[in-house]
Each structure stands twice: as C-alpha cells, then as structure tokens.
C-alpha cells in the first residue's frame, strides 16, 4: 500500500514538473537566439520552414535530455549505482532500454517539441495520451489485464484529448466543420506530431517498463537519458 501511494505521488509530481518543462521550453524557444534562427538568419539561412522547425525542435529536445543525463549520472554516482550503469548497458535489458530510449527520446521528444512550435500548448493533452497508449500496448504485447476502471480511464483520456484539442480553437457556429476551418496547416501538423509523440512514449513506457523489471530504476533512467541525449 505504501508503494502504491508513493508511486501515485511520484506520478503526480512527474506530471506537474513536465507541465513546467513545457512552459519553460515554449518560452525559451520564443526568445533569445532562437528568434534569430526562426527568422532564417545566420546558420539557419536557406533552410525550409519545416526543416527549421524540425532542426530547432531536435536541438531543444537534445538540450533537455543532455541536461537530464548529466543530472542522472551525478545522482547515480552519489547513490553508488554508476558501476551498475556501466555493467547494465551491454545486457539484454540494457539494450532493450537503449532501443526504447531512441523511440522515446530523439523521435518522440522531437515530435513533441515540433507540436509545441507548430500548434502551441494545445497539443499537451494529446501528447499526454502516452499513458493510455502504453496500457493498450501492454495489453497487446504482454497480455496484461485491463480492469473496467482502467478501460474507462483510457476512454476518458482519449475523449478529453479530442475535446481539448478541437475546442481549443474556439466554438464557431459551424460546429465541427467550423472548428476544422479555424485550424491552420501548421496546427494540423502540430497535432499529428503530438499523436506521434504519444505513440512513441507509449511504446517506450511499455517496452522500457518490461526492462525495468530486470534493472534498477536509477540505472534504467541513466541508460534512457544518456542514450536520448547522445
């Protein structure tokens, strides 16, 4: 019971802190040197609009993961798990975590930042579907049972993402047709990128969660963040 409470608390803190990450990421990439890059000056001159957004999103995601990797390595050293980290990399669980990290890091994280840049914070609840997608993948791959409450939660998550994603663009008189009419091409691409991020993180959660059963969580997060940052 105590582990359950601790897990729920950590999950709530994770969601709260990730919301802060999103806010700071959005603000940071709208100021300073990023503005010059988006203006197509300097090293960004000659790049297409999509190439520019993709490149900067990848850089933004990489900065986040590199900083996180440094922190996890320091923490692992403090608690005496750095040796376990080095030994675990070339094991089967370690290789699984590396593959999962590539899916969830360079691919999903970059897609998430692309979504933020092209559609704004409206994509956050869409990307947050990763937990529901991970539960579905776990049911398919590992035959994990889904209780009635879990299924209801998954349905609510999908419904909430659709409602927030659509009505975030206003409630015009034309109904759904009017809502879609208010969306720009960039916004549509951003929403698609958010779904890709949710899918990537869902896969990472399901596959990486399996590997975490054989590797300590402190070691697993080190492997994940270092792989993603590199």
Name every feature range the model reports, one short phrase each.
Residues 21, 107-108, 130-137, 141, ...:
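Membrane-embedded alpha-helical core segments of multi-pass
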Residues 59-62, 66, 111-145:
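Specific alpha-helical transmembrane segments that line the substrate/conduction pathway
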Residues 126-129, 133, 149-152, 189, ...:
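Hydrophobic, well-ordered secondary-structure segments
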Residues 48, 100, 129, 134-139, ...:
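Short, flexible coil/linker segments at or flanking structured domains
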Residues 1-102, 112-113, 146-158, 170-189, ...:
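Membrane-interface interhelical linkers
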Residues 107-123, 181-197:
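Alpha-helical transmembrane segments and their immediate interhelical/interface regions
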Residues 15-19, 101-106, 128, 194-202:
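Residue-level hotspots within the lipid-embedded alpha helices of multi-pass solute transporters
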